[in-house]
Amino acid sequence: MQANFPIAGIMPFSATDWPGKLTASVFTTGCPWACVYCHNPALQDPYGETTATVDELMELLASREGLLDAVVFSGGEPTMHRGLPVVIREVRRRFPALGVGLHTCGYLPSRIHELVDDPTSRPDWVGLDVKALPETLPGVVGCTPAGARNAWESLNFLAEASAAGLLELQVRTTAWHGGILEEQLPRLQEEVASRGLDLVIQWAHDVDSDGHYVGV
């Protein structure tokens, strides 16, 4: 099938990308942000190397039918690509028993609205990375203040969708010991809790005191 959806890699089996589910996890090229602790900076390039086609993804899912609970679209940032809803619809058409998950940083709220508002492209579960409070976010990911506002608009929209029973939502953040994000965790937890959700905290590994990735 034809879809603007560049795939940088596929993990055929994963037990860590959707809590409680065994998934195939699809990683797209391209990410608009440059998180200081990013372990996969090669995926930030939207024109980076691809390793599989959408047809090959469908073949893999067919070969594992009955073994997987779901497919998760991750990145990079999958909402960058116009082909995402097309691919989700094709998964639902071919594999109606398979759940669909999405990892996103929320920087494109309009596209998240489009996905969720259409039942044929709506994810069953979303893992939303709330990287920082709005005023801190530009320094952590290299976005503009407008980009930070967009990310929090996505949080508000997805929290409402979750409360309405349209999808499951996990909100998570990444922090490192001794950094500004660790200091702000209590406030970030309060902000997420005010939307009826819990914040999952992931601790960055192989980073320096400023959070920059130093691993090999």
Where does each model-flagged region fall?
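N-terminal "domain-start" segment that seeds a small globular fold
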Residues: 1-12
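Conserved AdoMet/S-adenosylmethionine-binding subsite of the radical SAM
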Residues: 58-67, 80-215
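Conserved G/P- and acidic residue-centered "switch" motifs that form tight phosphate/ATP-binding loops
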Residues: 77
